[in-house]
Amino acid sequence: MNERQFQKQVINFLNEQEIYHIKIWGGGFQRAGIPDLLCCVNGLFFALELKAENGKATPLQMYNLQKIKKSGGLAMILYPSQFNQFKQFIKEVKNWPKPNFPTQE
């Protein structure tokens, strides 16, 4: 499975689970190294860098993942072989108690 096929599979899963996510399109108008998907589930921010099974993150991608982790978010490189484990993790996070954040409601 190539990275594009895997990305489609992950996005379909996020849509099925009604997970808020944004697909980042790399290019001249965007800062380089931003993870492929920025997501929020049950108050948890996480960033996904999607790779084919033999893919490797660039140093800039690794730098941005580390910055997200240092800021309290979850950031990971996700490979197809980890997808089932990731799906289970998301389903568990959806069942966590909702954080008591102040809102403007």
Residue locations for each model-derived region?
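Catalytic phosphate/metal-binding cores of nucleic-acid and nucleotide-processing enzymes, i.e., regions
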Residues: 1-105
